[in-house]
Amino acid sequence: ANRPVYIPPPRPPHPRL
């Protein structure tokens, strides 16, 4: 049985100032 792996939502790329 495989354990459900929590996948965090993709974060938007932060603008590099």
From Swiss-Prot:
It comes from the Eukaryota. One of its GO terms (cellular component) is extracellular space. GO terms for biological process: defense response to Gram-negative bacterium; innate immune response. It is found in: Secreted. Keywords: Antibiotic, Antimicrobial, Immunity, Innate immunity, Secreted. Its main location: secreted. Induction: By bacterial infection. InterPro entries: Apidaecin. Pfam families: Apidaecin. The keyword Secreted applies. Disulfide bonds: none annotated. Belongs to the apidaecin family. Antimicrobial peptide active against many Gram-negative enterobacterial and plant-associated bacterial species. Not active against other bacterial species like H.pylori, P.mirabilis, B.pertussis or N.gonorrhoeae. This is Apidaecin +A.
